């Protein structure tokens, strides 16, 4: 298996670069966006938001303490890592690979990713196996790196947790092909994350929804928006009373923030 061929020096290099986004974050290049509280309040949500302008090196952050210090289960945003490991190890052949995982019948990998088919990626994780998955979590230094005993649910049951700033580092490295996976693996997952493409912008993201022990719902939206071939990376994490509309409310909140930042018109 290709993973075991990594040299120690290569793994150390990857380890040292995973935190580049955070290490470059200093008081001089962070703008605190406290005015975004109005959008969270209007949606009856709490949480944090971070935007990184790759061109200028500037961060725009709402609720900095929570953004860099609070951890949550990644929920279905972990499908980014799950897909990367699956492709890299050959457990996922390509985006057309079909699996029958529930009564709905066979589903393709690309559709499973777009539609957030939890059963599909639970099966992928089982095929990858606990030891191999753990080795990749360690190599990526992804979140708490904890799996527990269940290889097919650790990203859903709060065993594995991750901070918003770590999620930002993940999508940034994916965009630039800087994760310890082959180019093919990263390009395939990047393609799957594309949600909107028009003359003004391209927007790529993955969502996740999970529930805390207190009954509250936690939503993630992580990815990037491109205007004039320039990428901006974002992470939104929200929390609120569980409802069928919380994911839509979080997406609306994200769009309002991005619009205030001047996106969607192709002028950035």
Task: Walk through the language-model features, giving the residues of each.
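Short, well-structured active-site flanking segments
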Residues: 87-103, 181-185
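Structured C-terminal helix/loop/strand segments within mature extracytoplasmic catalytic/sensor domains
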Residues: 26-39, 43, 126-129, 175-200, ...
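Bacterial Sec-dependent N-terminal signal peptides
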Residues: 1-32
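Beta-lactamase-like hydrolase cores
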Residues: 25-68
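Active-site SXXK
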Residues: 71-94, 112, 234
């Amino acid at each position: 298996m290709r993973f075991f061929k990594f040299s120690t020096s290569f793994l150390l290099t990857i380890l040292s670069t995973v935190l580049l986004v955070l290490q470059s974050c200093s008081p001089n290049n962070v703008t605190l966006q406290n005015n975004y509280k109005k959008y969270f309040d209007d949606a009856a949500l709490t949480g944090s938001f971070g935007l990184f302008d790759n061109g200028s090196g500037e961060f725009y952050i709402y609720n900095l303490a929570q953004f860099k210090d609070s951890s949550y289960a990644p929920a279905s945003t972990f499908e980014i890592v799950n897909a990367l490991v699956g492709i890299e190890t050959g457990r996922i052949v390509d985006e057309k690979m079909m699996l029958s995982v529930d009564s709905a019948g066979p589903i393709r990998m690309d559709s499973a990713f777009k539609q957030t088919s939890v059963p599909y990626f639970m099966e992928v994780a089982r095929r990858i196996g606990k030891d191999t998955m753990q080795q990749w979590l360690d190599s990526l230094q992804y979140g708490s790196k904890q799996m527990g005993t269940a290889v097919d649910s650790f990203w859903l049951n709060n065993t594995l947790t991750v901070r918003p700033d770590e999620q930002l580092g993940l999508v940034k490295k994916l965009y630039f092909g800087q994760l310890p996976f082959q180019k093919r693996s990263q390009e395939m997952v990047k393609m799957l994350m594309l949600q909107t493409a028009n003359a003004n912008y391209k927007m790529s993201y993955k969502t996740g929804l999970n529930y805390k022990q207190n009954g509250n719902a936690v939503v993630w939206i992580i990815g990037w928006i491109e205007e004039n071939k320039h990428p901006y990376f974002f992470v939104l994490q929200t929390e609120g009373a569980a409802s069928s509309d919380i994911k839509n409310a979080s997406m609306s909140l994200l769009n309002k923030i991005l619009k205030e930042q001047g996106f969607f018109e192709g002028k950035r």
